[in-house]
Amino acid sequence: MTVEIANIVGSGDLGVELDVEPLEADLSTPYSEYDPSNYHGLYVRLEENGPLITVYRSGKYIITGCASMESLHETNEEFLGMLADLGVTEEDTQTGFTVENVVCTAMLDELVSLNALAIGLGLEVTEYEPEQFPGLVYRPEEIGAVLLVFANGKMVITGAKDTETAESAYEYFQSKVQELV
């Protein structure tokens, strides 16, 4: 099985402080919500069931829920264009937009005992407390990602900054499992 993207998160900084309450009223999007008694961020969706943008008074924002890098960057560009049209920012505002986290899923080629895996991989790079969490957490220093491995063979790869890192993490882990089996 290949590694599949589950979620991509990116963030940027508009470089200006925002009054988010009137901003919510000015936005013409399918979904926006600002309830400071519940949370201090403004939630925005540019399309129904689309990626979620959380905007803060500081001008910082986070985009979550994208299934591809293309979707993440398109959502960012559309959001910035909308803010420029409202006069909130300049057309060419540099936000330093970066990918923060690529979350992927995959399946192990074969099932293994998580207890045996924790011991084989090394207790210094694994956490496995089945009474607290049903998965094994693997944090190898060699790769830029954290892997969650479950008894049914499903894996979640998180902390990567790009899909290549997630795929490399999967391949690295598969080779480690093969060494142990």
Swiss-Prot record:
One MF term in the entry's GO annotations? DNA-binding transcription factor activity
Q: Give yes or no: UniProt keyword Transcription.
A: yes
User: Could you give a single Gene Ontology term from the biological process aspect?
Assistant: DNA-templated transcription initiation
Is Hydrolase one of the keywords UniProt gives this record? no
Q: Which UniProt keywords apply?
A: DNA-binding, Plasmid, Repeat, Transcription, Transcription regulation
Highest taxon of source: Archaea
Q: What InterPro entries does the record point to?
A: TBP, TBP_archaea, TBP_dom_sf
Repeat region (sequence), residues: 5-83, 99-177
Role played: General factor that plays a role in the activation of archaeal genes transcribed by RNA polymerase. Binds specifically to the TATA box promoter element which lies close to the position of transcription initiation.
Q: Which family does it belong to?
A: Belongs to the TBP family.
Cross-referenced NCBIfam families: PRK00394.1-2 (NF001593)
- PANTHER family reported in the protein's UniProt record: TATA-BOX BINDING PROTEIN (PTHR10126)
> Per its record, how is this protein called by name?
TATA-box-binding protein C
**Species per Swiss-Prot/TrEMBL record:** Halobacterium salinarum (strain ATCC 700922 / JCM 11081 / NRC-1) (Halobacterium halobium)
User: Which gene name does the record give?
Assistant: tbpC1
